[in-house]
Regions:
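N-terminal intrinsically disordered, cationic/polar leader segments
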Residues: 1-205
Length: 205
């Protein structure tokens, strides 16, 4: 109660001491230790964001490119207990199952070509890490749960493959959320978790 404020430069010095280290929970823990020692804090929380690159091969042509995932590593130190939290934004395409059925109905009954509407979709997956889990593992879990991830390198044959993949896996937002939850719940390296899925509307105003 007797403290009146904080010197922001002291906070930054705690972080800059680890500027040359690789981005990891271990480095964040070391920075948090310095922060608590330098400022005499009992509880603390730190979150660091980054764009994490992973090489991705196209669906059919075999081209390779870099997919950048928005991630955040969060460390919470409260009452002597530390919690590691990993956040991942997974971007995918979602074809509306209802729209797909209507398109097929138009083709079958009237010979009319129709296009089902698809949305650019994002799932924010936040997990409490209790085992040996890293970003690549989270991406692999997300890809297996919902396979229609947006692509990096695309030729005509890749675009066709992506269209086929979307048609074979139409999905509502609530179903996507359930699939992500099932994948996270089944992994022993994950404690608590939260899934926020958003299918960005392409039909309604």
């Amino acid at each position: 109660a007797e403290k009146k404020g904080i010197n922001m430069s002291r906070i930054m010095r705690s972080f800059y001491a680890h500027a040359d280290s690789a981005f990891s929970f271990g480095v964040i823990e070391a920075a948090l230790d310095d922060y608590k020692r330098d400022l005499g804090s009992f509880d603390a929380r730190i979150q660091m964001r980054s764009a994490f690159p992973m090489q991705m091969t196209s669906l059919r042509s075999g081209l390779a490119g870099w997919q950048y995932y928005d991630i955040a590593l969060e460390l919470v130190d409260r009452a002597g207990v530390r919690t590691r939290i990993l956040h991942l934004d997974y971007v995918y395409s979602s074809t509306c199952p209802c729209s797909l059925e209507l398109s097929e109905h138009a083709r079958a009954t009237r010979g009319q070509l129709a296009t089902p509407h698809s949305q650019r979709s994002v799932a924010r997956l936040s997990v409490v890490v209790t085992g040996d889990l890293w970003v690549e593992d989270m991406v692999d879990l997300a890809r297996k749960a919902v396979v229609t991830e947006t692509q990096v390198m695309v030729k005509r044959e890749d675009e066709q493959a992506f269209a086929e993949l979307n048609a074979a896996n139409p999905i509502f937002v609530e179903d996507a959320a359930r699939l992500f939850c099932e994948a996270l719940r089944a992994d022993p390296r994950i404690g608590d978790f939260r899934v926020v899925a958003s299918h960005q509307e392409s039909l309604h105003s």
